[in-house]
């Protein structure tokens, strides 16, 4: 579903959802779709009309129509939210095409008739007519009209403009076609000197608005197929277990979730961009939404059938109806490739989507924060970290006096001011995880000793969690801690420890009660890395660097005052360490600096078709990531849990960074044959889908925690 921002959009969506849930409406919609399939034989090709009328009665077609034309005076975002829900319910008839017409028709009488559902509209996929400007008539054959049926009006392209023709006139003949997606009427239309009206809206805007509305439909299809697959995977049993407990099925469903979430945010963004006075904002947003939405709807519909198995391949199950709808959307919009190429062309021409979050609630803080940032910016580079720490700007989400206890909105405002002043926030690396854990669970003495020094850059930290044979499976760790006079003796081996050879302190998990259950009996220690008994052996990586290390602990003494929290409660603290994140959003271009750097490298380079398409898909991933970032930030500002969006952002983010590095290597000088910085970056990014939990583990976690699939 298109991500909601306002209460009005939530209410609009719930209105359609509630209507579709009723036995009469829901059953009628599906029955009408199936009746339409038989319409060319013994069925009823007009079975959509009563259901369409019911949807019109909810006010869907009037939601974005001005009040003086009989509408509700709402936004295109409201309209697309309702179209999304209608697509999820597979409401038949010219829903999307009529919705598009309400946005581009200027005649008040016709607009009012469309808003009420008295009239409906189709949209021609291709032109093929000759226009006589002297008589304002058109003649010719239009091969395919989506939503084309007797009694409606039709929008059709001609000579760079869009025309409006009424099928009720004698000069128009409508010939029904058997559509792949038989939930929608499809027709061939012949015009013989038929009266036409040239729309006042530009041809480009009509196409962009059509893409926006159809992207909302695609998002609805992607979500229904995901929900259907997940629901079935929870109850269908094989080999005595629900199939949703099998990793292969979990990963299939988690991938569907990733596609659905990207389709959601892209469709929502296109609807939002429609209100921008700068038409290029809608152009780029609509192209992104159409390309992502078409592919997401198609792929999810196919994977839904895969999860359903044999039942998904039967005529009786509705899954194939959504597969048909997905391909109908793609066919109408000309395929995702068309919009992908448009995304690439617009981006290379310098068009960028402008993204932001409404920070009105903290606008009063801006002068104060801007002044504090200006003081930091005036300092030499080497003194800025201490100043940022002392002012609470380094980690504003931490409690005072170390941070500002900043709300999500204030955090974003601070990021904006730092970016505007070109002040970079230093990276505390593992310190970002260690310090919050100490703040939340440590003693006052621990907090005072470690947190300020960490923020000022005096202490570099490493994380002693992963072990040979256990990796990131913390419950299986074997490093033991044995009681000693005044403290503990730690013995064991850690691996994949970044920066251990440079770190002054380490956060270490060790088993203090070997008889306790796996997740119990673990304690959280702060280890001085200069303590006798610690041996560090660098591990050479595929780049040639040695950032990772093996760390051997041989009766390493850790005093009692270096235990954080309660003994045997380390698992809970480790979860704090791994979960702590601040609210953040890119403050520069929506594509991010890495993509901008790639575009600079490409310059005027001649790319073949395959390279162009790969570039387009990278741009889509960059844009989707930025849109997810904005959505997560908006949810945080509104006091809501980002949930699925946050997990999806991590999954697509690492894939994107890997794909970007590989593409840059292949198009750079040497083409991957000669070792250079691009080759280094490619090799260096291979760890991104492994470090901190592999991609496959993250998919499993997403399937279980977000989709509720059984273990």
Curated annotation (Swiss-Prot):
Pathway: Steroid metabolism; cholesterol degradation. One of its GO terms (biological process) is cholesterol catabolic process. It comes from the Bacteria. Changing residue 236 to A: Displays less than 2% activity with cholyl-CoA as substrate. Cannot bind FAD. Binds 2 FAD per dimer. Induction: Induced by cholesterol and repressed by KstR. GO terms for molecular function: flavin adenine dinucleotide binding; oxidoreductase activity, acting on the CH-CH group of donors. It catalyses: 3-oxochol-4-en-24-oyl-CoA + A = (22E)-3-oxochola-4,22-dien-24-oyl-CoA + AH2; 3beta-hydroxy-chol-5-ene-24-oyl-CoA + A = 3beta-hydroxy-chol-5,22-dien-24-oyl-CoA + AH2. Gene3D superfamilies: Acyl-CoA dehydrogenase/oxidase, N-terminal domain, Butyryl-CoA Dehydrogenase, subunit A, domain 2, Butyryl-CoA Dehydrogenase, subunit A, domain 3. Its cofactor is FAD. Keywords: Cholesterol metabolism, FAD, Flavoprotein, Lipid degradation, Lipid metabolism, Oxidoreductase, Steroid metabolism, Sterol metabolism, Virulence. It is an enzyme of class 1 (oxidoreductase). InterPro entries: Acyl-CoA_Oxase/DH_mid-dom (IPR006091), Acyl-CoA_Oxase/DH_mid-dom_sf (IPR046373), AcylCo_DH-like_C (IPR036250), AcylCo_DH/oxidase_C (IPR009075), AcylCoA_DH/ox_N (IPR013786), AcylCoA_DH/ox_N_sf (IPR037069), AcylCoA_DH/oxidase_NM_dom_sf (IPR009100), Mycobact_Acyl-CoA_DH (IPR052161). One of its GO terms (cellular component) is plasma membrane. Its EC number is 1.3.99.-. Disulfide bonds: none annotated. Involved in the second cycle of side chain dehydrogenation in the beta-oxidation of cholesterol catabolism. It contributes partly to the virulence by increasing the efficiency of beta-oxidation. Catalyzes the dehydrogenation of the five-carbon steroid side chain of 3-oxo-chol-4-en-24-oyl-CoA (3-OCO-CoA) to yield 3-oxochol-4,22-dien-24-oyl-CoA. Can also use 3beta-hydroxy-chol-5-ene-24-oyl-CoA, and shows weak activity with cholyl-CoA and deoxycholyl-CoA. PANTHER family: ACYL-COA DEHYDROGENASE (PTHR43292), ACYL-COA DEHYDROGENASE FADE34 (PTHR43292:SF4). Contains two ACAD domains separated by a short linker. The two domains interact to form a single active site. Homodimer. Belongs to the acyl-CoA dehydrogenase family. This is Acyl-CoA dehydrogenase FadE34. It comes from Mycobacterium tuberculosis (strain ATCC 25618 / H37Rv). The lineage of its organism: Bacteria, Bacillati, Actinomycetota, Actinomycetes, Mycobacteriales. The gene is fadE34.
């Amino acid at each position: 579903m298109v991500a909601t921002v306002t209460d009005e959009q939530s209410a609009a969506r719930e209105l359609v959802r509630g209507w579709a849930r009723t036995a009469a409406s829901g059953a009628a919609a599906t029955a009408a779709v199936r009746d339409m399939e038989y319409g060319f034989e013994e069925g009823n090709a007009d079975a959509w009309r009563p259901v369409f009328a019911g949807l019109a009665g909810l006010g869907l077609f009037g939601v974005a129509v001005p009040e003086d034309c009989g509408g509700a005076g709402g936004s295109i975002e409201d309209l697309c939210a309702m179209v999304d829900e209608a697509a999820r319910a597979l409401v038949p008839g010219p829903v999307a095409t009529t919705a598009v017409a309400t946005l581009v028709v200027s005649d008040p009488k016709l607009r009012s008739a469309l808003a009420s559902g008295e009239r409906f509209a189709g949209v021609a996929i291709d032109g093929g007519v000759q226009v006589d400007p002297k008589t304002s008539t058109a003649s010719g054959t239009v091969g395919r009209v989506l939503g084309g049926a007797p009694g409606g009006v039709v929008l059709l392209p001609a000579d760079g403009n869009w025309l409006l023709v009424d099928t009720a006139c004698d000069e128009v003949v409508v010939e029904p076609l058997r559509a792949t997606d038989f939930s929608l009427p499809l027709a061939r239309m012949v015009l013989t000197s038929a009266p036409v009206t040239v729309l006042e809206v530009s041809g480009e805007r009509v196409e962009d608005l059509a893409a926006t509305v159809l992207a909302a439909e695609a998002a609805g299809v992607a979500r229904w197929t995901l929900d259907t697959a997940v629901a079935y995977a929870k109850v269908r049993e094989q080999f005595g277990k629900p199939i949703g407990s099998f990793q292969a099925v979990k990963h299939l469903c988690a991938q569907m979730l990733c596609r659905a979430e990207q389709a959601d945010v892209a469709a929502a963004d296109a609807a939002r961009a429609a209100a921008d006075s700068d038409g290029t904002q809608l152009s780029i947003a609509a192209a992104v939404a159409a390309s992502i939405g078409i592919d997401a709807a198609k792929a999810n519909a196919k994977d839904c059938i895969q999860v359903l198995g044999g039942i998904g391949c039967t005529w009786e199950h509705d899954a194939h109806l959504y597969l048909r709808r997905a391909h109908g959307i793609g066919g109408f919009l000309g395929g995702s490739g068309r919009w992908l190429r448009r995304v690439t062309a617009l981006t290379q021409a310098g068009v960028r989507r402008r993204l932001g979050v409404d920070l009105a609630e903290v606008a009063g803080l801006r002068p104060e924060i801007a002044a504090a940032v200006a003081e930091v910016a005036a300092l030499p580079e080497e003194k800025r970290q201490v100043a940022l720490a002392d002012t609470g700007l380094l980690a504003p989400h931490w409690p005072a006096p170390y941070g500002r206890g900043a709300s999500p909105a204030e955090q974003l405002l601070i990021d904006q001011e730092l970016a505007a002043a070109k002040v970079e926030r230093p990276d505390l690396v593992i310190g970002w995880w260690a310090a919050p854990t100490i703040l939340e669970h440590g003693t006052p003495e621990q907090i005072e000793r470690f947190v300020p020094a960490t923020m000022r850059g005096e202490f570099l930290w490493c994380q002693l969690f992963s072990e040979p044979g256990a990796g990131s499976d913390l419950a299986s760790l074997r490093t033991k801690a044995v009681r000693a006079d005044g403290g503990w003796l730690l013995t064991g081996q850690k691996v994949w420890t970044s920066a251990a050879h440079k770190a002054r302190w380490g956060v270490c998990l060790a088993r203090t009660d070997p008889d306790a259950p796996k997740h119990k009996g673990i304690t959280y220690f702060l280890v001085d890395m200069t303590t006798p008994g610690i041996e560090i052996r660098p591990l050479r990586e595929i780049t040639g660097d040695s950032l990772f290390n093996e760390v051997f602990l041989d009766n390493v003494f850790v005093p009692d005052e270096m235990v954080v929290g309660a003994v045997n409660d380390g698992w809970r603290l480790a979860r704090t360490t791994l979960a702590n994140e601040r609210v953040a959003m890119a403050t520069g271009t929506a594509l991010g600096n890495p993509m901008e750097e790639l575009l600079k490298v490409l310059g005027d380079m001649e790319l073949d078709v395959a390279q162009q398409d790969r570039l387009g898909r990278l741009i889509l991933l960059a844009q989707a990531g930025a849109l997810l970032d904005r959505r997560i930030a908006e949810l945080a500002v509104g006091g809501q849990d980002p949930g699925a969006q946050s997990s999806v952002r991590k999954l697509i983010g690492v894939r994107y960074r890997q794909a970007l590095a590989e593409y840059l290597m292949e198009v750079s000088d040497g083409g991957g044959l000669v070792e250079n910085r691009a080759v280094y970056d490619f090799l260096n990014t291979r760890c991104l889908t492994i470090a901190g939990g592999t991609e496959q583990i993250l998919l499993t976690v997403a399937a279980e925690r977000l989709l509720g699939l059984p273990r």
